A protein has these predicted regions:
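Catalytic alpha-helical scaffold of carbohydrate-active enzymes acting on polysaccharides/glycoconjugates
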Residues: 1-163, 170-188
Length: 188
């Protein structure tokens, strides 16, 4: 029998709210990026606890396991960080239940998913490049700080070692890999 493994990212990521861009360059002007014919991405909502229950039923039915990339903190408009379990307590509890059932792996999807201070929608262009947390132009100490803090939040709440990192947008650098290794991550 073959095993099925699947992955979902952006759980708890404020990129859902703030990363907005158009399919066309002209579409990034003012409000146009929000219009359905031009919109390529964002905003979209967080899955709610009841929806996770439906996902769990499907996973059990097919003997599948889901890797869930959780962004450890939501970034508010003002740049304040709110840990995922505080911002979304019901959803966090649902994920903890799925972890306990052995059908989920919780993966680190970064602390913020974005470059703080540059995460808000722009009037005249896309903000897409600022919704990747581990660019090579981000200072080394930021990579280490973000991996450390996200590991602490996720491991404290889920009470299990977090050994997988899914970098937002699959963007990472050698600093990211060093930080991940230092804080116990085995798979990127």
């Amino acid at each position: 029998m073959k095993k099925i493994a699947i992955r979902i990212d952006d759980i708890g990521a404020s990129a859902k709210r703030f990363e907005v861009y158009s399919k066309r360059r002209i579409g990034n002007f003012l409000f146009l990026k929000y219009l359905k014919p031009l919109k390529a991405w964002g905003p979209y909502r967080e899955m709610v606890a009841g929806e996770w229950g439906q996902v769990f039923k499907i996973l059990h039915r097919y003997g599948a396991k889901l890797t869930v990339g959780v962004t450890a903190s939501w970034v508010e408009w003002n740049g304040k960080l709110v840990p995922f379990p505080e911002k979304f307590p019901d959803e966090a509890a649902a994920l903890k239940e799925g972890l306990g059932q052995g059908i989920l792996e919780i993966a680190n999807h970064g602390l913020t998913h974005c470059v703080i201070g540059k995460h808000l929608p722009r009037l005249f262009f896309s903000n897409r490049k600022y919704h990747r947390e581990f660019w090579d132009w981000i200072p080394r100490q930021t990579h280490f700080m973000h991996i450390k803090q996200s590991q602490e939040i996720l491991q404290d709440y889920f009470e299990t070692p977090i050994i997988t990192l899914i970098p937002p947008g699959n963007v990472y650098s050698s600093d990211t890999l060093e930080a991940a290794n230092y804080y116990g991550i085995k798979t990127v």
